[in-house]
């Protein structure tokens, strides 16, 4: 697969995983997990997914473990949403970038404000 296609597939996988994790998973361990980066291998067989999660290292490790446990479900969901010949195996890891935590905080605050406006449109 050429580099541009690899980047497009990586971005599509990131968008879909973000949607599934944020809105369709019921596991409380992943409530504050955010997909920050996806790198799909050139043969499209493997995807390395970086996850940022607020909280201490123990909480982050629990979120990664929950996502690893749900990898089969997530992969099936990706298969139903994306037109790919091969849906990659998903490998989750913690994003260790210090700027990511502040970005996650910002995104969570924005999501709460948006949700509040949807529930109370007159405000």
Curated annotation (Swiss-Prot):
Name of the protein in its database record: Ribosome-binding factor A
Give the family, as the similarity comment puts it.
Belongs to the RbfA family.
Q: Where in the cell is it found?
A: Cytoplasm
Q: Which organism is the protein's source?
A: Solibacter usitatus (strain Ellin6076)
Record's HAMAP family?
RbfA
**Biological process, per Gene Ontology:** maturation of SSU-rRNA
Q: Which InterPro entries match?
A: KH_dom-like_a/b (IPR015946), RbfA (IPR000238), RbfA_dom_sf (IPR023799), Ribosome-bd_factorA_CS (IPR020053)
Q: What are the UniProt keywords, alphabetically? A: Cytoplasm, Ribosome biogenesis
Q: Name one Pfam family in it.
A: RBFA
Q: Known SUPFAM superfamilies for this protein?
A: Ribosome-binding factor A, RbfA
């Amino acid at each position: 697969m050429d580099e541009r296609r690899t980047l497009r597939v990586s971005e599509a996988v990131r968008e879909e995983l973000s949607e599934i994790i944020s809105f369709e998973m019921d596991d409380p361990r992943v409530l504050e997990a955010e997909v920050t980066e996806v790198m799909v291998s050139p043969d499209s067989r493997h995807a390395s997914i970086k996850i940022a999660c607020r909280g201490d290292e123990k909480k982050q490790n629990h979120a990664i473990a929950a996502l690893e446990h749900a990898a089969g479900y997530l992969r099936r969901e990706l298969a139903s949403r994306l037109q790919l010949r091969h849906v990659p195996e998903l490998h989750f890891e913690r994003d260790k970038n210090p700027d990511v935590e502040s970005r996650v905080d910002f995104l969570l605050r924005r999501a709460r404000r948006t949700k509040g406006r949807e529930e109370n449109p007159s405000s």
